[in-house]
Amino acid sequence: MAIHLYKTSTPSTRNGTVYSQVKSNPRKNLIYGQHHCGKGRNVRGIITTRHRGGGHKRLYRKISFIRNEKYIYGRIITIEYDPNRNAYICLIHYGDGDKRYILHPRGAIIGDTLVSGTEVPIIIGNALPLTDMPLGTAIHNIEITLGKGGQLVRAAGAVAKLIAKEGKLATLKLPSGEVRLISKNCSATVGQVGNVGVNKKSLGRAGSKRWLGKRPVVRGVVMNPIDHPHGGGEGRAPIGRKKPTTPWGYPALGRRSRKINKYSDNFIVRRRSK
């Protein structure tokens, strides 16, 4: 999709950009409302995740991550914007009359035909088990547990690579740089997730950020000592510590936070790179 620039008529539009997409109304049987009461709060109303709140009301689009319609050909009808993710979605009309949303693969256009199953062609948008894919295939929407649906590589522009197959396991290189083992029977979709240039988009103003449900981020060094370990001092003062910390006093910027001896450590060949 192309990036469109606003005319520099006002300060709020001077630096803003917008992506063009196919405009169409979502299907009513594939959407439902969400109940957001106090974003970033727990049941007691206490903030558990900072910098969240507000935002425009959204309708959730039901996405089919499983792709369990075996050997039933489907055609892409629309490519739509989804406010709940940074990737686009496309509506698939299958031969049996079923209609579903899936993540939009990069390069797929309206009118393309997709299919899922074993030994299907290696074409962008087709879904098949890892055991039937050749080495070097670019994939996304990857299952971790057989039959549970895709859980890995679903963000806009994300793509993984199948680099090896040995025994019952396949080796994948994920977008983070992590090399991980997954069962060869798990399914994945061929190609890369669309909307690759979403990270080049400029919101242009603070109000656009608030529409997304993201609140302002205040630096700890400008707070009071009771609010943050970096706070306090006369005027513009340093943090007063050897290393920066979180608001709760834990080391920040680089400390590994992954749980020790996690069950999935056995499937990680190489940890992600920073």
Curated annotation (Swiss-Prot):
<dbReference type="InterPro" id="IPR002171">
    <property type="entry name" value="Ribosomal_uL2"/>
</dbReference>
<dbReference type="Pfam" id="PF00181">
    <property type="entry name" value="Ribosomal_L2"/>
</dbReference>
<dbReference type="InterPro" id="IPR012340">
    <property type="entry name" value="NA-bd_OB-fold"/>
</dbReference>
<comment type="subunit">
    <text>Part of the 50S ribosomal subunit.</text>
</comment>
<feature type="region of interest" description="Disordered">
    <location>
        <begin position="224"/>
        <end position="253"/>
    </location>
</feature>
<keyword id="KW-0687">Ribonucleoprotein</keyword>
<dbReference type="InterPro" id="IPR005880">
    <property type="entry name" value="Ribosomal_uL2_bac/org-type"/>
</dbReference>
<dbReference type="InterPro" id="IPR014726">
    <property type="entry name" value="Ribosomal_uL2_dom3"/>
</dbReference>
<dbReference type="InterPro" id="IPR022666">
    <property type="entry name" value="Ribosomal_uL2_RNA-bd_dom"/>
</dbReference>
<dbReference type="InterPro" id="IPR022669">
    <property type="entry name" value="Ribosomal_uL2_C"/>
</dbReference>
<comment type="similarity">
    <text>Belongs to the universal ribosomal protein uL2 family.</text>
</comment>
<dbReference type="GO" id="GO:0003735">
    <property type="term" value="F:structural constituent of ribosome"/>
</dbReference>
<dbReference type="GO" id="GO:0016740">
    <property type="term" value="F:transferase activity"/>
</dbReference>
<dbReference type="InterPro" id="IPR022671">
    <property type="entry name" value="Ribosomal_uL2_CS"/>
</dbReference>
<keyword id="KW-0934">Plastid</keyword>
<dbReference type="GO" id="GO:0003723">
    <property type="term" value="F:RNA binding"/>
</dbReference>
<dbReference type="InterPro" id="IPR014722">
    <property type="entry name" value="Rib_uL2_dom2"/>
</dbReference>
<protein>
    <recommendedName>
        <fullName>Large ribosomal subunit protein uL2cz/uL2cy</fullName>
    </recommendedName>
</protein>
<dbReference type="GO" id="GO:0005762">
    <property type="term" value="C:mitochondrial large ribosomal subunit"/>
</dbReference>
<keyword id="KW-0689">Ribosomal protein</keyword>
<dbReference type="InterPro" id="IPR008991">
    <property type="entry name" value="Translation_prot_SH3-like_sf"/>
</dbReference>
<dbReference type="GO" id="GO:0032543">
    <property type="term" value="P:mitochondrial translation"/>
</dbReference>
<dbReference type="Pfam" id="PF03947">
    <property type="entry name" value="Ribosomal_L2_C"/>
</dbReference>
<dbReference type="GO" id="GO:0009536">
    <property type="term" value="C:plastid"/>
</dbReference>
